[in-house]
Amino acid sequence: PGMSPERIADRLHGFMRELGYERYGVQGGDWGGWIAPLIARRHPESVVGVHVNFAMGAPSEGDPTEEERAFLDFRTRFDRAETGYSWIQRSKPQTLGYGLTDSPVGLLAWILEKFWAWSDHGDDLFETFDRGLLLTNVMLYWLTNTVTSAARIYSERDRTPRPVERLEVPVGYAKYPREPWAAPRSMVERAFNVVRYSEPARGGHFAAMEQPELFADDVATFFSSLP
């Protein structure tokens, strides 16, 4: 309890300082797409740049553009059909945790369903992801008994105010085609100082695992462009 995204951001900054880095870059997808910008907001003097492949951006104060409206309509449908997991993790993480820590099959299903729903895999998940890599991902939660604490971040986020100021630290935004939370560039630019924008040809929510070479190249290109 109490391990909010803000606290995680401060912990990660502290780790970098302990390692001797006065200035560093951060990258984030999924929850990292939330926490990486928080590190820059809370410690802007230390962060040279932020690269994200998950960004919901900020809505327009006026009428949304056609692209923004299409995204918002999609998100309304998507949230209704695909975010039940989020609501239970936000409201009852401890209750859910008892079930998932007691059943390896239940934990496997809970996690792999998201790989299926959110990735760019066609109709064969194992053409995109190595089976061993997926099992390793699940086992990290199982062997360490941490699925409950991982779920609690959803609840902790709701207890803290969300940032409203535009982030002025340089940001690189990679908009992958099968990322459900990939907001249009215009929305992201309202929230962040986007100095590099890219649309990789393939990839989804788990871009670093799905397309590691494309992902690494995009991240490296962004940071190499910074002064």
Regions found by a protein language model. Give the residues of each.
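Residue-level signal for the nucleotide or nucleotide-sugar donor/cofactor binding architecture
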Residues: 3, 7, 207-210
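The feature captures the conserved acid-bearing segment of alpha/beta-hydrolase catalytic domains
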Residues: 8, 15, 66-93, 163-166, ...
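Active-site phosphate/pyrophosphate- and oxyanion-stabilizing loops and adjacent acidic/basic residues
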Residues: 13, 37, 186
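Acyl activation and transfer enzymes in specialized metabolism, enriched
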Residues: 18-19, 28-29, 33, 208-214
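Conserved hydrolase catalytic core segment
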Residues: 21-70
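C-terminal subdomain of alpha/beta-hydrolase-fold enzymes, centered on the catalytic histidine
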Residues: 89-227
